Regions:
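ATP/adenylate-binding site constellation spanning eukaryotic-like Ser/Thr protein kinases
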Residues: 59, 94, 173
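Ligand-binding loop in jelly-roll beta-barrel domains
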Residues: 70, 83-107
Length: 195
């Protein structure tokens, strides 16, 4: 189905799913998903929509506002929004992004956890993009599989909760951390670490 929104190129598409009663009660479920290619003039503004939005920017930038938070997501970044709050997003340059609306499972708790500390914009990675592609694949009417969709949505949220980065370890304690990692099966004393 072609979207009617201003600023969308004809190559954009929209698709919807109708989750089963089981999915609505027990799974993360997909409501609609889209690949948008848009130009300046594209804008969405709503006071309330009873679902959550996850968008992955492939090129350009997506300017977003949700509740009291705002972000400018650029290529390779992802936006996660609670659409039950007033929200707005728009582009100021040619932009391509993949996005889906979802709900169910522990969506509200996960979105609160993820956006409460770091905001609504996250760095994406190749793994997250693969989950988006799988969500779109399993959302297709020919292969529709709401159980796999649920796993993929949860996997995206999991990737955001546990980023693919290791914390910087201060140089002063790095030798102790490395020693513990190498000798974790042994009794390690504070005196040994101090040496």
């Amino acid at each position: 189905m072609k979207p009617p929104d201003k600023g969308l190129l004809l190559s954009s598409y929209v698709d919807f799913t109708i989750p089963s009663p089981f999915a609505r009660e027990h799974l993360y479920y997909l409501i609609q998903y889209r690949r948008y290619q848009c130009v300046p003039g594209y804008e969405v503004e709503r006071d309330f929509l009873d679902m959550y939005l996850c968008a992955y920017v492939r090129s350009g930038s997506l300017h977003t506002f949700c509740g009291e938070q705002s972000a400018n997501a650029t290529a390779g970044q992802l936006v996660l929004m609670d659409c039950r709050l007033p929200h707005r997003y728009y582009v100021t340059e040619p932009t391509e992004f993949l996005w889906f609306h979802f709900s169910g499972g522990e969506s509200a708790a996960y979105v609160r956890l993820l956006t409460g500390g770091t905001g609504i914009c996250f760095d994406g990675n190749h793994e997250i993009l693969q989950y988006f592609e799988q969500i779109f694949y399993y959302g297709d009417k020919q292969v529709y599989n709401e159980h796999r969709i649920s796993v993929c949505i949860q996997s995206v949220l999991c990737c955001l909760a546990v980023p693919d980065t290791k914390p910087d370890i201060p140089e002063v304690i790095r030798p102790a951390v490395e020693y513990i990692a190498e000798h974790f099966r042994e009794d390690v004393t504070l005196e040994t670490l101090a040496d």
